[in-house]
């Protein structure tokens, strides 16, 4: 998708650049970053990230800087209006989800409730 189109989930330049670097390390240009939501964590739901070389029926693909972020339809409904970012700080380096739909989040930011 073009940056000009409204997408329900933003994929930041920082996240896309990190994905590009990790894909180059794996030497597999077909890999995409998949973000998903599962039940669990201290707040009820938790975010997960994995690399995947498949796009399933119903998945949304968001492209940026030549790499792709993939999210399944069920997870997307909880992520609409949010963004996937990458941060490096004192607590380490990680992909993060900024989710305006989350009513509460845990201290580490990987778990939330709606």
From Swiss-Prot:
Positions of iron-sulfur cluster binding: 42, 106, 108
Iron among keywords: yes
Cofactor note: Binds 1 iron-sulfur cluster per subunit.
GO biological process: iron-sulfur cluster assembly
Database matches in PROSITE patterns: HESB (PS01152)
SUPFAM superfamilies (alphabetical): HesB-like domain (SSF89360)
Function: Required for insertion of 4Fe-4S clusters for at least IspG.
Family that this chain belongs to: Belongs to the HesB/IscA family.
Subunit structure of this chain's protein: Homodimer.
Protein name: Iron-sulfur cluster insertion protein ErpA
């Amino acid at each position: 998708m073009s940056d000009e189109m409204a997408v329900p989930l933003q994929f930041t330049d920082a996240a896309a650049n990190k994905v590009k670097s990790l894909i180059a390390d794996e030497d597999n240009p077909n890999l995409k970053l998949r973000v998903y939501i599962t039940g669990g964590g201290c707040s009820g739901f938790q975010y997960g990230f994995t690399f995947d070389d498949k796009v399933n029926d119903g998945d949304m693909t968001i492209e940026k800087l030549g790499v792709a972020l993939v999210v399944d339809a069920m997870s997307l409904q909880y992520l609409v209006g949010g963004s996937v970012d990458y941060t490096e700080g004192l607590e380490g380096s990680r992909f993060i989800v900024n989710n305006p739909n989350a009513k509460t989040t845990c201290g580490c930011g990987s778990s939330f409730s709606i």
